[in-house]
Curated annotation (Swiss-Prot):
GO terms for molecular function: protein serine/threonine kinase activator activity. GO terms for biological process: activation of protein kinase B activity; negative regulation of gene expression; regulation of stem cell population maintenance; somatic stem cell population maintenance. Homodimer. Interacts with AKT1, AKT2 and AKT3 (via PH domain). Interacts with PNPT1; the interaction has no effect on PNPT1 exonuclease activity. Belongs to the TCL1 family. It is found in: Cytoplasm; Nucleus; Microsome; Endoplasmic reticulum. It comes from the Eukaryota. InterPro entries: TCL1_MTCP1, TCL1_MTCP1_sf. This is T-cell leukemia/lymphoma protein 1A. Enhances the phosphorylation and activation of AKT1 and AKT2. Enhances cell proliferation, stabilizes mitochondrial membrane potential and promotes cell survival. Keywords: Cytoplasm, Endoplasmic reticulum, Microsome, Nucleus. PANTHER family: PROTEIN P13 MTCP-1, T-CELL LEUKEMIA_LYMPHOMA PROTEIN 1A.
Length: 116
C-alpha cells in the first residue's frame, strides 16, 4: 500500500515591505507578487494576501491608483504588524505556507489600540 507524505504548514518570514505594483498586485522586496482579497464586515477590515506568481504589467503611479481602498505600501513593524503609508497599523493574524501556497491575513487595527 502506498503511503502519502504528510504535509505540514510552514511559518515563513514576513516580507519586510509590500508595495503596490499595479491594481490588485503587490510586490515584496524579492519581487514576489502578492494578490489581495479584501474582507469587510461591520467591525473588521481584513485582507488576505496570497503569494502567487503572475505576469507583471507596467508599474502604476499613485495618481493612477486613486481611489484605492488598500494602502499603497506596508512596512513590517514589531509585534507582528505592518504600518501602512497612511500610518495605520495592520495586525498579522496568520502567515502560513502549505503545499507551496503562501497566505497572510492582515487586520486593520483600531487607531485607539495603536500603541507603539
Amino acid at each position: 500500500m502506498a503511503t502519502q507524505r504528510a504535509h505540514r504548514a510552514e511559518t515563513p518570514a514576513h516580507p519586510n515591505r509590500l508595495w503596490i505594483w499595479e491594481k490588485h498586485v503587490y510586490l515584496d522586496e524579492f519581487r514576489r507578487s502578492w494578490l489581495p482579497v479584501v474582507i469587510k464586515s461591520n467591525e473588521k477590515f481584513q485582507v488576505i494576501l496570497r503569494q502567487e506568481d503572475v505576469t507583471l504589467g507596467e508599474a502604476m503611479s499613485p495618481s493612477q491608483l486613486v481611489p484605492y481602498e488598500l494602502p499603497l505600501m506596508w512596512q513590517l513593524y514589531p509585534k507582528d504588524r505592518y504600518r501602512s503609508c497612511d500610518s495605520m497599523y495592520w495586525q498579522i493574524l496568520y502567515h502560513i505556507k502549505f503545499r507551496d501556497v503562501e497566505d497572510m491575513l492582515l487586520e486593520l487595527i483600531d487607531s485607539e489600540s495603536n500603541d507603539e
